[in-house]
Amino acid sequence: MAMNYSAKDEVDGGPAGPPGGAAKTRRPDNTAFKQQRLPAWQPILTAGTVLPTFFIIGLIFIPIGIGIFVTSNNIREIEIDYTGTEPSSPCNKCLSPNVTSCACTINFTLKQSFEGNVFMYYGLSNFYQNHRRYVKSRDDSQLNGDPSALLNPSKECEPYRRNEDRPIAPCGAIANSMFNDTLELYLVANESDPKPIPIPLKKKGIAWWTDKNVKFRNPPGKESLEEKFKDTIKPVNWHKAVYELDPEDESNNGFINEDFIVWMRTAALPTFRKLYRLIERRDDLHPTLPAGQYFLNITYNYPVHSFDGRKRMILSTISWMGGKNPFLGIAYITIGSISFLLGVVLLVINHKYRNSSNTADITI
C-alpha cells in the first residue's frame, strides 16, 4: 500500500495520527528560546573600538594599583615568630612533652612608631581549618543558646559531642582546638630602668557585631553561667569551662566570649591570622607604640609542633583598604601595564598593516 508524501508532515514531525487521536510531533515548542530566536548582540571588533579599550583599562588600573601599593607600604606591621623550634629560641624549652605550663619572653625592636589604632593578631601556619569534617564539627543551635541543644548536641560534633556521659559545651572539633596562648606586650622605656611599661590590650571589640549579637548567645535564664552549664562538661582539650573564659566580665563570658567567637569563624587557608587584641590610640600628640625596645610575654599552651605548624604574633596598623596587602596593588599595576602594552603593540601592528593595505590598493 503506497503512502503519500507530504512536506507538511515532515515539518510537523510525521504524518497526522489517526482521527480523534492526539497529534504526535517531535518538533520543539514554537518559543523564542527553544527555536533559538532570542535577541542577540555581537560586537564588531575593530581597531577603533579595541585599542581605546586597552588604553583606558591601562590608564585606570595603573594609578589605582600605585595608590593601593603606596597605601599598603605605609601600613606598619611586624611579625614575631615564637614557635620555638630553633634551639636558640627562648620558647624552645616549651616544646618538651614533660612541660605542662610554660612561659617565655621574646625581645624585639620597633624601628618606626605605630600611629593610630594598632591591632594585635595571632597567626598559625599549616592548620587546615577548611577541612570539611572540621568545618561541620559544631552545633550552631547550641552556640545560639538553645537549651535543648545544650544538653543534646548535634551529631555533627562527634567525636567531641559527649564526654564522661555528659554533653560537651561547646561541642565539636572547632571549639575543642581553640587557641589558648596568652600574649602580653611591654615597652622598655628606659634601658637603665628594669621596670617595663605594660601596653594596655583591649579584649573587647575584636569580634564581628553580627557574631557577637546574633549568632552567639548564652542559654537564657536568670541563673549564673555556672548554673546554666552545670549539666555539661568542658571540651576535652580545654583547661577550664566555658563559663570561666572571662569571669570578671559577664558580657564577655561563656558563648559570647570574643576570643571564642573569633576562633569559631574558620579560616579558608592553612596560613591565617586572627585578631587577638586592640591597642587604642591615646591621643594625636603621642604615637600608640613609640619606636624602641619591647618584649613579648607568652604563656605557651597551644601545641603546633605535632602537625609541623608555626605560631606568630603580629602587630599592624590599618588603612581604608584594611591591613597590609601589597599583592592587590601589584596585581592592579600588572594588569594595567599588560593592557597598556597590548594596546601599544596592537596600535603598531594596525598602523603597519593598514599602511601596507593602502599601498597595495594604490599599486592595483
Curated annotation (Swiss-Prot):
Report one GO cellular component: transport vesicle membrane
Q: Which residue ranges does the entry give as Cytoplasmic-facing topology?
A: 2-49, 350-364
Post-translational note: N-glycosylated. Contains high mannose-type oligosaccharides.
Q: Give any Pfam family that matches.
A: CDC50
As for subcellular location, the record says:
Membrane; Cell membrane; Golgi apparatus; Cytoplasmic vesicle, Secretory vesicle membrane
The UniProt annotation puts the region (Disordered) at: 1-28
Family (UniProt): Belongs to the CDC50/LEM3 family.
Chief place of localization: membrane
Protein name from the UniProt record: Cell cycle control protein 50A
